[in-house]
Amino acid sequence: MSKQSKKSNKNHNSGINPSGNLRPAKALGQNFLIDEEAIWAIVDGSEVDKDTLVIEIGPGPGALTCPLAEEAGRVVAIELDERMIEPLRVKTFSYGNVEVIHGDILEVDLNSIIEKNLKEYGLKTVRIVGNLPYYITTPIIMKLLEMGTTANSITAMMQKEVGDRIAAEPGTKLSGAITYSVHYYSTVSKIIDVDRESFYPAPKVDSVVLRMDIRDTAAVAVKDEAFFFRCIKAGFAQRRKTLLNSLMTLGGYEKDTIQAALDAAGIAANRRAESLNMEEFARLAEALQGA
């Protein structure tokens, strides 16, 4: 069957039988993707080829795993739900290039897994791909970005509201603390919007697939990343307040000191966090540290 014909079959290769044994676990936030158009949009948007090692997060019953295995050099699928492990191994056995690992993506030593597979199979690129549980989307993305992985990109399905905030440009009304964190480490592009009926069971919200291409160097140069991100989080902690007031949540700074730092950074005290671009937050963090 051609890729195009696969895309036209909503349930092809999904592995989902609503009356079968592999029922989604509500406690794990499982909603299985069953829409072939969305599945192949993820595969194509990830730019997977035979020189690619794919790390798949939360493969479930393998709806995305099998198309990835067709296109990639190797797929390492990391699944938390023990019920899925053996059926997925059986389902992907014939591809000969899929390894299924039982583990928590927030706990596994991902860099070691990547290093081992790159060395053993001589692959050139690393793509992380996943349909992320809504309730831990941000922790997963931030772990992947902060760990210093050798991955080239992350392509992830997530709740549309979260995805729209991540994809927003820093310094715009839709931006939030997560916007700056993700854009600091990567460039972000939207692959496809996915409606709720594309899942089993259907969630209460729509989804979006984003691709985050990891930067070789950070978007801005900062002396202290941890403090830089603290400033951003403080700025957005009470996002309707002005920076002069919201930055008081940093602790340890008098209002006069914050005013002086804002002046030194060339930022008006009555501006809100959402109006600052990345460079302005970097200047502000440096000014506060020097205050």
What are these regions (language model features)?
Residues 208, 212-214, 220-257, 265-268, ...:
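An accessory alpha-helical subdomain
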Residues 1-230, 263, 274, 283, ...:
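Catalytic cores of RNA-modifying enzymes
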Residues 269-275:
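Short, flexible active-site recognition loops that position polar ligands and cofactors
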